Amino acid sequence: YIPTDNTAASNTEAIANVVIPEKVPVVAGEEGICKGCGVAALSISYYDLGYKTGEMAAEILADGADVSTMPVAFAPNVTKKYNAANCEALGITPPDGYEAIAD
């Protein structure tokens, strides 16, 4: 598993050069990493995450909410994606409900 991480996102080709020949499937935390070196992802939407962050900022700045008492918020939706080429190379059939990542 590779979570959402800028270093990993910048090095997906190097990761793929190691994991694909060794037949190691990588599940990624977001679509970009999955497209580069993964087989599947429950991908967050950075737009939705940013929108939620904006709502929380408004609660703090406009409404005076105490950040220390606010609950942790999560990305409201995830999308199920898979990398068709990597799945084929590793002999993996993606589960129903997953959408192929466009090239």
Q: What are the functions of these language-model segments?
A:
Residues 26-40:
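Flexible loop/hinge segments that line or gate small-molecule binding clefts
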Residues 1-5, 39-46:
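Second-shell loop/turn segments in exported
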Residues 44-65:
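Hydrophobic alpha-helical segments within soluble ligand-binding/sensing domains
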Residues 1-8, 26-29:
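Periplasmic-binding protein-like
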Residues 11-18:
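A short acidic, amphipathic alpha-helical/loop segment
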Residues 9-10, 37:
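Pocket-flanking alpha-helical
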Residues 59-103:
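Hinge/cleft segment of the Venus flytrap/periplasmic-binding protein
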